[in-house]
Amino acid sequence: MEVYTMRRFRWMGMLLGVAILLGACSSKKLSESDQLLVDYLVQDYQTYFDFPLVLNDFSATVQKEGELIDQETNEPIYEGDRVTLIRGSEPKDNEVVRVTCEYKEGDLNGIFVEIHSEPTEYSEESLEQLAVAFLSEHDIAKQVSLIDQKVKENEREIIFRFKTEQNTVIKVYVNQDLKQAVGFFKTDGEDL
């Protein structure tokens, strides 16, 4: 009975979040298929992260696969449909700035949460352990080996690139200041 009640409250909370998102998140009316992608983003965000998110503060954008083309290569920039929630106001410390999901053929290909944070000291080894634990806790991958890691200039996330037991590559983003995983992305391994 207790498990049923917890599931019911979680489901009701998710529906409330979607309802708020429908009513207040975007000033422009989304198509039915775009709204479905936004609903998926909210569900996936709640599955992987517990950072507070007040949906009234965000607007939604949807970019369908193939809409954005790289001018140099004439190839699509994204592998799937990309959905983004963007905060409309100035964030405070540790508040979500943006949530981006990519869906490839209807399946979640990756999710990333950008959080406003102040610089702190960290150990790259401990952050790698956080990335591995995140993959395991969310049943994304049980066994991984580190390929490499990178900190992009002027960004607070370290990107760890892992090879899985199925020989796929997953990038995990760990915020150095929060010492928490803030995203993952399944990739062919060519880019970091």
Residue ranges and their predicted role:
Residues 45, 49, 62, 135-139:
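Sec/Tat-exported extracytoplasmic proteins
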Residues 21-24:
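C-terminal motif of bacterial Sec signal peptides marking the signal peptidase cleavage site
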Residues 96-150, 192:
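Long, charged/polar, surface-exposed segments that mediate recognition or autoinhibition
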Residues 33-52:
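Post-signal peptide N-terminal segment of mature Sec-exported envelope proteins
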Residues 17-18:
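Hydrophobic membrane-insertion alpha-helices, especially the h-region
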Residues 4-12:
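Bacterial N-terminal signal peptides that target proteins for export
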Residues 26-28:
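Bacterial signal peptide processing site
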Residues 53-102, 146-177, 185-191:
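Exposed beta-strand-loop-beta-strand "reactive/processing" segments of non-cytosolic proteins
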